[in-house]
Amino acid sequence: MALRHRFRAPAARTSLALALLAALPALADASGAPAAQPSTLDTVVVTASGFEQKITDAPASISVITREDLARRPYMTLLDAVRDLEGVDVGETRDKTGQGTISMRGMGADYTLILVNGRRQNNHGDIYPNNFGGNQFNHIPPLDAIERIEVIRGPMSTLYGADAMGGVINIITRRTLDSWHGSASIARTVETDDAFGDDSTVDFFVTGPLLPGVLNLSARGSWYERKASNPTYAPATDPAGGLHTRPLGFGSGSKTVDNTNKAGGITLAWMPSDNQTLSLDYDTSRQTYDNRIRINDSGVEEYPVGTVDTINSIWRASNYCSGASGANAAACRANGGTWARRADPRVGYSASQAFTRDAWALTHEGQWDIGNSFVSLARVATNNDGRTLPFTVAERERLLAMIDGTGAYAGMALAERRALAESTFLPRPKRTLESAQYTLDAKLDMPFQAAGEHTLVVGTQVIRGDLTDGVFGTEKGTPGLKQEHDMYSLFVEDNWKVSTPLTLTAGLRYDDHKVFGDHLSPRLYGVYALGEQWTIKGGVSTGFKTPKTTDLYDGVIGFGGQGTLPFFGNPDLKPETSTSTELAVYWQHPRGHNFNATLFHNRFEDKIDSQPCGAGLALRCTSSGEYAELGYSSSNRTVNIDEVVIQGAELAGRWQISDAFGLRANYTFTDSEQKSGAEKGLPLGNSARHMANATFDWQASDRLSLFLTAEARSRRYRGVSAVTGKELYYKDYTVLHLGASFEATGWLTFNARINNLLDRDFTTYQTTFTDLNGNGIYGDVTNEVLFEDDYNNKDKARSVWLSMNLRF
C-alpha cells in the first residue's frame, strides 16, 4: 500500500495561471510598443576561439546571457544565471549547505570550467570534501559588475586545458570607463510559506577616471543573505491508523541554515597609449554558514552541515572483526579473524563554516601591427575554514582506553574519564583546507592572408599550485602535509576562412603535468554559411581533466562517517579524457526569429571514482598506514574505472510573434550509459533525460514588459531498485514563473517575479507499508515502513522576488 502525504488540486493551479494571464492586458497600453531586442545569433563572443566572433561563426555551441537578462531574475549564485539554457542542468543535487551544482551535457559539476574574464577559477584539488562542492559556484562577481556570461557546451581543452570537459562558463565583467558611471541594485525574495527563509541581495558597481585618459578605476561589491529554511514532511498514516513522521535533512532535504555571501573587488586600468592597457584587479569573497547544534521538532540534537565536536560525539566505541569478515565474535573467529574493539569518535566540524576566496590578477592587453596580445599573471587562494581534524590512530587508542577504563585509566570513575577525555581531545585542532595557485596566461592572435583569411592564436599557460589538507599524513601520524600541482601548456589554433562560406578551425594543445606526464588535446571544427540565414557547423573536440591534487596523494585523503572512516588516494591515476562530436544547424530571420539544433556524442574514458578496497578484494588499500592496525585495511580508494558514452540533442529558438510579443524556448535530450565498471549499462549521474524551458514575453509599453517562464524536467535517474533491478526515476515536474520589469525613469528600473507560480510542492513522497511479522503493527520491524521521495531536491514553495536597480 502506498500513500502520498499531500494532494494539490491541479485545477486550482490552472485556474490561477489563466486568471493571471487574462489580467495582463489591463496592465499595459492597448497600442503595444516594440519589444526589447534580445541577444541574437549576431551577438559577438570571445570564449569559443580566443578572439571576437559572432555566435553563428564561433567554432562551438555557445550561448550568451546579457546584463539585461540577469537583471530580470533572482540572482544569488551562478546557477541562477544559467539554469534555463539548453544543455545545462542545475538540478542534479544539492550539497550540505543547500547549494546546487552546474552540469553540462550530462557531465557533472567537476567537469565545468569557470572563468572570469578568461582567467580560470577552479581549484586544482578538493577543498570541499564531504559534499560541500556547490560553494565553488558562489565565488562570482556581483550582479551589477557583470557585462555578460558566455557559456560553451562541450569540451574546450584545446584552448583552456584541464577541467573543460563538460563545458566552459566565462563571466565577463564591465570594463572601466573614462567617465563616471555606476549602478546599484537591491532585491528581496519573500516566501509565502514561512517554513522557507527569505533572500536579500545588495549589489553595486562604479567606474570612472582618476586621471582622464590615463588611469581608470572600477569598484564592485555585493552582500547576499539567505535565511534558514525548516520545512517538514506531512506525516504518513499506516493501514492501522498509526502516524509516521519523517524528518527532512539538510541540503537536498531542503533544510538550510542562515548564510551570507559577501564579495568585493577593485580594478585599476592604466592606458599608457591608445592601444595598450595594463590592469590590476583584486577580488575577495566570503561565505559563512551557521552550524550550531540545534534541537529539531522531535527533540533530537541535529548538526546542520556536520557533527560539531563535543564529548558526546567522541565518546563512542564498537567491536569489529580484524583480518576477516564476521558479524559477531563467533563468526569472526570461525573465519580466522580476531574480534577486536576500537574507538569511533565522530568529529570534523566547528559551530561555524566559512568558505573564502582571494584573488588578484595583473593583466596586459595590447594591440600591435601583427595582432592582439593578452598576458595575465593571476593568483587564486581558496580556504575552507571551520573543519577540524579527525582522530589519529594514537589518539583513538588512548580514547578507547578511557572509554573502557583500561590501562592507565583502570579504576577511574566514568565521569572522571569523560572529563579527562574532554580536556585531552577537545577542542580539536583545526583541519587546514587551503588551495592556492599562480596562473600565467599568454596569448597572441594574429590575422594574416595565405590561401584565404587566417586568424592564428598561439599561447602558453603555466600553473603552479599547492594544496594543504590537515588529513594528509595522518596515516603516518604526522597530519598537515602539502601536495603540489605544476602544469605547463602550449597551444595553437588556426581559424581559416577557406572561402566566403567556409571556415575551418584546427587546434592542438600540449600539457605537461608534474605527476602523470604529457597530454595532447586536438580539435577540428568547420562552419559553413548557406546564405545569409542558414549556417551549418560541427566538428570534433577533445577534453581532459587532471586528477585532483587530493586524489593523487598516496595516503589518507579524507574521512567518512563523520570523521571515523579514512579514505585513500592513488598516485597512479591517469587523466580523464573525452572526445566529443557535434553537428549543428542555425537559422536566423531579419524579423528577429532564430532557431538552432545540435546533435552531440561524447565518449568519456578513464573516469575517476572511489571503489571499495581491502583484503580479499581486487583493489588493495595500499596506503592505509597506521589505520590498518585498527581494521581500516578495508575502505575506499580512488581509481580509473569507467568508460561512458553521452549523447543527445539540443534545440533552441525564438519566434518574434509581433513587435510586442515574443516566444523563446529550448529543449535538451540527454542519454548516458556507462560502458564499463561496476555500474555498466547504467546512466552516469542523475541528469534529467528531458529538459525544456520556455518564456513568453510581452513588451506592453515603452516602459513595461511582462513574461511568463516555464521549466520542465523529466526522467531524472535516481538509482536501481534493490528488488526488481530496474532503473528508477524521480517524478517529472513543470514550474511556472511570472515576471515584470518597469522602467520608471531612464535611471531607475523595478523588477518583480512570482517564483513557482502554481506553488508546486517538492516535499511529497511515497510510503510503502508492509506487515512483515503479521502483528498489525507497522514500524516495529526493519523495512516495514519505507519512504521514497518524489523529487531529488526539495525546492522552495511560491515566493515573490522584488528588485530595484539604480543607474547613474
Give the label of every model feature segment.
Residues 47, 79, 83-123:
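Extracytoplasmic beta-strand/coil segments of soluble accessory domains associated
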Residues 186, 363-365, 374-386, 529, ...:
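Membrane-embedded beta-barrel scaffold of Gram-negative outer-membrane proteins
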Residues 269-286, 331-516, 529-531, 596-599, ...:
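Face-selective signature of the C-terminal outer-membrane beta-barrel domain
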Residues 121-153, 204:
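Short acidic/polar hinge/loop motifs at secondary-structure boundaries
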Residues 138-185, 807:
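A beta-strand signature from Gram-negative outer-membrane beta-barrel systems
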Residues 124, 603-605, 712-719, 741-808:
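C-terminal beta-signal and adjacent terminal beta-strands/loops
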